[in-house]
Amino acid sequence: MFEKLSQAACSEPFAFLGPFIDPTQGALRVWMPGATGVALVLEGQPRIALEREKESAFILKADLNLHLTHYQLAIDWNGIEQLVDDPYQYHGIYAEYDDLHTPKTMYQHMGSQFMTLERDGKSISGIRFLVYAPHATAVSLVGSFNDWDGRRHPMQRLDYGIWGLFIPGLTEGVSYKFEMKGPKGEGLPHKADPWGFYAEQYPSFASVTYDHARYQWQDAQWQTRPVTEKRKEALSFYELHAGSWKRNEQGEFLNYRELAAELVPYLVDMGYTHVELMPVSEHPFYGSWGYQPVGLFAPTSRYGSPDDFKFFVDACHQAGIGVVLDWVPAHFPSDDHGLANFDGTPLFHDPDPRRGWHQDWNSFIYDLGREQVRRFLVSNALYWFEQFHIDGIRVDAVASMLYLDYSRSHGQWIPNMDGGNENYDAIATLKWMNEEVYKYFPNAMTIAEESTAFPGVSAPTFMGGLGFGFKWNMGWMHDSLSYIKEEPVHRKYHHNTLTFPLVYAHSENYVLSLSHDEVVYGKGSIHNKMPGDEWQQTANLRAYFGYMYGQPGKKLNFMGAEIGQTAEWNHDDQLQWFLLDFPRHQGVQALTRDLNHLYRNEAALHDQDCIPAGFEWRLQDAAEQSIIAHERISEAGERILVVSNFTPVPRDEFRLGVPNKGRYQLLLNTDDSKYAGSGYEVVVDVKSEAVVSEDLAQSIVLRLPPLSTLFYKLA
């Protein structure tokens, strides 16, 4: 046993260290590498020196029964004394089976947890560490409290593949990792805590102890608001990368609190309902934008502490802004300190690269056929809702999870048990995650980034769906951008590209997304996808945004689009805020603000987004003129007419059939001079006439500005 202890290879330290159960064998054994002496300290009694048994072992052979007695150790480090509680007197370090295997409670027990244990009538505070490493032959806790010496604190092998140890007296802010021996006794890289709540940056990547109970939330009014049906709400998401929205004068990141001070009033002014953060789970490589996470339970410390991130969410909620996080359960990177070969085996991924390795992203794929991996991920999703009060998660790369042959050629994948390409384990996991989230957090929302036609992504699980609340409409994004990139003179040949998305617009609960994916890897900015000179580019962009807000579906824009950013997004720099010195870009920002407020204020533009009753075509086939028109209809029967002219040719007397007799009043014109438009005179109030047009008995005559979208409300 001494040899195992000296090699940090002991799996049952409680059988050898601490108080002896049989006092005839002695009273106490202590293993303290590097110490020159150890003494027993009992309250109100003289100290008793322990004898050196081996080089690092000390033993007390007195006839004392310390099995139920609280004691301390006075350790002599070459003349410097340290008084500590002996961790190996605390046997009550475990938790109930259900607590360790139920997603809702796992994060309250695994990893590092502050707790108080009773011993000999005393309340002893400290931190209990639990880690799942079933194939390890030994696990030690190493950290700043023991000079990263794996011999000092061997952990006890418990049941169900879990190792544990309670360290009395530890406080917040202590760095730690796990030192393990693999199945054959081989040494492994030090591992960060998979359940760690806080982490350091390069070079240590160590986990850090953190107490969730300390932060005092101020968002009770938000948290207790009535449960609503999100499909009927106006949802406008501002997708944001925390490191590159704004920088300080030195070009450094804003921390979470500084970001809150700048961002929250901006979101309120601009009319957004939610901020959607690109992944904040700890990730070692900044250039991954968070999509290669290692610490799933830790908000990245690049921008501050977990308390600082809570402050950010708190500030958003107090201002009426919801917070959605990007969540990455599809894959994880191969960094040595992370989940890869965690206990010397492919614990979190399939050993067969045809199922366990993502060749596009050079990352491991979670093995969702393993119950403990599924629980780990579902627990992580619930954790962010409970501990950080988030309002939703946007699940990244769902298609890569659903299909075993995703981005793979013949021979590079393994079929399921029925010979197909569906990943049954991933499907079951996503369903379970959604059920758990909505069960415990009924006001939450889950959103899928799913790029295929997999059926029922946003259908309830009891109807055979995956159970997401919403799905990004990747088809709309692709088709609409493909259309708007065409020169106006050519758009008539691509008219069907613009109208086709309405064929399936209500097959899912859709979010119309113009995400970060569209402004990277040489794709350019949304602004620069527009054809023509500078004025036409901006006019096209305004018309396109108007068209987007008039279409059925919730809205998402990546940061920078709202100011007409001209450069492709660069995560190493802030947005081009200087563009707001120019009227054209001021106009795009002002339009985005007005579109958000219009969308939120007019029920017809949002409360039937997800059902066919909320949309009617008024003009679908005017390809030669590149004009479309439709009406949006609220549950209460309110109607808003949306007309888009995608050519630079103004239409002086454009007759359009309408189904209802009445007056149509202008709500918004994307070509208005206040948006730096042409200022072409439009009709602000028009009464329908009994003139047949488009097979409708009533019609109105409008003036359509060049490259514009108009909104009229039926009075």
UniProtKB/Swiss-Prot annotation:
Keyword terms of this UniProt record: Carbohydrate metabolism, Glycogen biosynthesis, Glycogen metabolism, Glycosyltransferase, Transferase
Highest taxon of the lineage: Bacteria
Keyword Glycosyltransferase (UniProt): yes
UniProt keyword annotation of Transferase present: yes
EC number(s) on file: 2.4.1.18
Annotated catalytic residues: D396, E449
SUPFAM superfamilies tied to this protein: (Trans)glycosidases, E set domains, Glycosyl hydrolase domain
A GO term, aspect molecular function: 1,4-alpha-glucan branching enzyme activity
GO biological process, one term: glycogen biosynthetic process
Known role: Catalyzes the formation of the alpha-1,6-glucosidic linkages in glycogen by scission of a 1,4-alpha-linked oligosaccharide from growing alpha-1,4-glucan chains and the subsequent attachment of the oligosaccharide to the alpha-1,6 position.
Quaternary context: Monomer.
Protein name listed in UniProt: 1,4-alpha-glucan branching enzyme GlgB
Species this protein is from: Vibrio vulnificus (strain YJ016)
